[in-house]
Amino acid sequence: MKNKNILTTILVIALLSIFLIKSTNNNFFKMNSKYKLQSFNLDQDPLKTKIYTLENGLKVFLTEYKNAPRLQTSIAVRAGSKHDPSDATGLAHYLEHMLFKGTNKYGTINFTEEKPLLDKIEDLYEEYRKVPMSNVSEREKIWSKIDSLSNEAAKFAIANEYDKMVSGIGAKGTNAYTSNEKTVYINDIPSNQIEKWLKLESERFRNPIFRLFHTELETVYEEKNRGLDDDGRKLFYEMLDAVFPNHQYGQQTTIGTIKHLKNPSLKEIQKYYDKYYVPNNMAICISGDFESESMIELIDKYFGGFESKEVPNFEVIKERPIEKIIERSVVGPQAERLYIAFRFPGASSKDIHKLRMADMIMSNRTAGLIDLNLNQSQKIIGGGSFPFILEDYSTHVFYGSPKQNQNLNEVRDLLVGQIEELKNGNFPDWLMKAIISDLKLEQIKKYENNQGRANEYVEAFTLGIEWSEYIQMIDEMSKLNKQDIIDFANQYYKDNYAVVYKEQGEDIVEKVTKPNITPVSVNRESKTDFLNSLLAEEVNEIEPVFIDFENDINYGKIDEVPLHYMKNFENQRFELTYVFEAGTNVNPVNKIAFEYLQFLGTDSITSKQKQEILYKLGSEMSFNCSDDQVKINISGLDENFEETVKFLESFLSNFKSDEEALQKLKEDILKKRSDAKLNKQTILFNAMVNFAKYGENSPFTNKLTNEFINNIKSNDLVSKVKDVYASKHIVKYYGPRDISDVEKQLLILHKNKSNLNDIVDAKMFTEIERKTPTVYFLDYDMKQAEVIVISKNEKLNPTLIPISRLHNEYFGGGMSSVMFQELRESQALAYSVYSTFTTPRKINDSHFQLSYIGTQADKLEEAMMGMMNLLNEMPKSEGNLNAAKEGIVQKIRTERITKSAIMNYIERAKKMGLSSDSRKNIFENIENFSMDDVENFHNEKISNQNYTYLVLADKKSINFELLSKYGKVEFLTLEKVFGY
């Protein structure tokens, strides 16, 4: 979900005072604004927040965090789908999309000539929505006029000019999202571009113009149809509908109903904007490298002139108590699972602290009731819980999936059984104290990045909770005792819940059909004075910082074992990882062996007790086996470093086999394998892509047979773990201790540090040289069609990294890319589309060109034709190319790889045969590339290749004669691409 907004006319800014000419929308005026700093006890605030309120009511949340010369920015509006009119749902989401379309000052070649056409289009939509949907001929007649006028108006529009500007200042992660009661606009920007960003955002929200609406409308249709194919979304919406039969939470989805989507109203969207997009209903939330005093001056300079308005009170619909169990079901092709949901009061209720504590007692990933009694005991698959807290009401959701030969009713009963355990107080006395420690540690981790910090402000503001109260949540939870939770549980958890079963089957649902849309002009070369002026403003450039492979990591030794060390200067958290080059490409059994470990105990402790000990320590322990590596990881607070390492080493030396656990693990592995073949993301992006690259013998299919799994013995798995643990490895440490202390402690504690075994060479997989174009089709029950076009190129060539980075940014890498503009903005053929020339992870692997488009099945012909036209003949735009260059340069200047990520970055680079930071090569060369260079790269590496086409869709909706134009059509089976 992404996309675009506030008022009309001119903003003239002096250095210390602001003179604003009143706009036609009356949200924007005067003025010499003032702002107030909110006072509260900063000692209780780990973020040391400064909260300002401008004279017009705009809230500003600021936290300084100088980890990198960048800022995470979020502009939050307290308006979401619950505020949509009941007869025009989806407005908040539509408006979010339109806030990327520009104003009367940017996004247009000539607004004076454009506006009369936009006014006519707006009126035509009002006519259109009044005509009954049964009157097809009349609606088609009006739609034809809308399409024609939209094409005329588009001649004056400049598509994606907002995206060009944010890219030009080096922004990353540009996006937006709408939910029940908030709409949030986000950017990650360089710290030397603050004023440009504020100037752009001020203009964006001043007077949004709803241009290019009918192509964006089709994009929303695509988003709706993707939702209709998403079993998880269907399950969640059905749950909300059951729990909230009257309130908008259950009766108005963010995307809107099909009926309302087909009858949009620009006038209603404008009313929504005028009503809710006012400063006293908005907040600017920023975390990063800046000075708060100068930041608030700039925010006041650019936003102080917005006029406050009274925001209508939201009338909360009172729900009647749920007095019996409500059962619902949804169907779809993906794996079975269920939700159990209880209704609770809203975010401001004092009971919310008890709800959060109850949720952690039920499920905290390690030692909750569901974690231990159901997951660790292997009674269900993937059980857990989460609180869904909103302003008016909240929901406590429990979830789980069935094992082999288990039905959803059994999963429900097992989850409800754990709720009864909570009500009876059958949880250990120490657990609540450990939960508080866990929450504090999770908060430390969350606050180690700007996004986590800014998101906290958005959450508090949009829930209507004062920050001074929000930051005391953990302290308030720490005051609760066991009896408080028992009483709370018995008050709320009764036969008063909704259970929604996600069953397998064919879902007969209406989809949003494709309207006839004539492709519109995108005016790629045009630029407004606003863009030229903004990007021409000079800033003090920030010098890039590149990784020094020799000096940015400290290297030590633990006897024979290499130690890679990075110091944590920020807090008391540590991470310790043992890395073995012994992944599934060495032996597929290793994956099951290390999965088996998590369910084992020792002679002195059970598997459950192992989890409880870790949770008491505030530590986590994990075992992961990928294609390449086995990683044994522990993390936690430094005060428990020695004890955690001792526990890990003792466990690895003394774990004992458990035949019952192994049998259950086998069953679960086979069930998860079966479920994976129902997941369209796994099918397309893993199974089919690997098949295209390697054929049937690929890293993805390098798995044990089901027969082998059924016959494997505990001794085999125990032997594999011990073999790996006794082999050569490296130790990676990130934490607050000095390297000498780490070496000293691990020399004592780490047992396998000498006389280590060599690891056998990994299996190599041969990439297929395809001589002729081929279309591989796989049948899947869904409304959409998803297509990947892929072609093999040369082996890893580091000299291609700079030019391919520029090509990707220009051609297919973002919202201002050629592919996005043509296929989404101009032709409205897709919600999601991208193209990338990949850089392989290993020396002997090849580059691949991979392009993706997700579209409605009835638009597949146009979508594939549009994509192939672009792949075979790249449109040229000097303006877009220069913007792509500048965006890359600004990102590299301000990107900082820090903390433990430095070790991971160097490790990946060395596997590619690199001895230095590839970003330095990009930075030093990218300005030298011309359009001819990019075109030559495209013609040589992308155009007219022996493409392999991967198509995932419902065969009943596909014209195979069309597909045969692209190559020989071969029908794949799940068994063939999964290897089992």
Question: Model-found features: residue ranges?
Answer:
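Short strand-connecting beta-turns/loops that link adjacent beta-strands
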Residues: 66-68, 278, 333-334, 392, ...
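His/Glu-based metal-binding/catalytic segments typifying zinc-dependent metallopeptidases
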Residues: 225, 241, 312-367, 399, ...
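Mature N-terminal segment immediately following signal peptide/propeptide cleavage
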Residues: 38-75, 554-570
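Bacterial Sec-dependent signal peptides at the C-terminal "C-region" and cleavage site
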Residues: 13-42
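N-terminal Sec-pathway targeting helices
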Residues: 1-11
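Charge-rich, well-structured scaffold segments of protease-associated domains
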Residues: 28-29, 53, 64, 111-311, ...
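Active/ligand-binding-proximal structured segments within catalytic/core domains
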Residues: 57, 66-111, 115, 334, ...
